[in-house]
Amino acid sequence: MEQGKHLAGLILAVFLLQGTMAHVKEVKVDDNREDGSVILICVTNDTTITWLKDVEQIGSGDTKKNTWNLGSSTKDPRGIYKCEGSNNQSKSLQIYYRMCQNCIELNPSTVAGFIFTEIVSIFLLAVGVYFIAGQEGVRQSRASDKQTLLNNDQLYQPLKEREDDQYSHLRKN
């Protein structure tokens, strides 16, 4: 019973690996050039090669060298590239150059995120201003709020004779 499981596992492994062992062309990248250009190299023995970018044919390259020049790396040659021979089998290679480390790619979801964040921040700022402005501040005193300290609008209160009251404690002779 134990040998039957191992045999079934071996047959399954051979069957599944059959597709990966088939000869599939590879695409390599050469971007260490002095002029800054990016060159794709198709590793195959076919003489006729068709180059594809994002499933669209971009042309036939140099069949002697099996290469395709993408141009300068500063022009951002991004995409999924394939080289196909006569049997139309190829591995795809995704190329993505990001020249700016601090740049933001403006796709629709990024723009929507910026707009949503802006609306939320303006709303929160408006709510904050509303609550701060709505608070009661220091009230202005009214005439009815004043306490009468001296009767009949007296400006000064006369001191009693020979009594200095509180001023006598400040100065000592």
UniProtKB/Swiss-Prot annotation:
The modification Phosphoserine is found at S141, S144. Glycans are attached at N45, N88. A di-leucine motif and a tyrosine-based motif are individually sufficient to induce both endocytosis and delivery to lysosomes. This is T-cell surface glycoprotein CD3 gamma chain. A motif (Di-leucine motif) lies at residues 149-150. The lineage of its organism: Eukaryota, Metazoa, Chordata, Craniata, Vertebrata. The chain crosses the membrane at residues 112-132. GO terms for cellular component: alpha-beta T cell receptor complex; external side of plasma membrane. Keywords: Adaptive immunity, Cell membrane, Disulfide bond, Glycoprotein, Immunity, Immunoglobulin domain, Membrane, Phosphoprotein, Receptor, Signal, Transmembrane, Transmembrane helix. It comes from the Eukaryota. Residues 24-94 form the Ig-like domain.
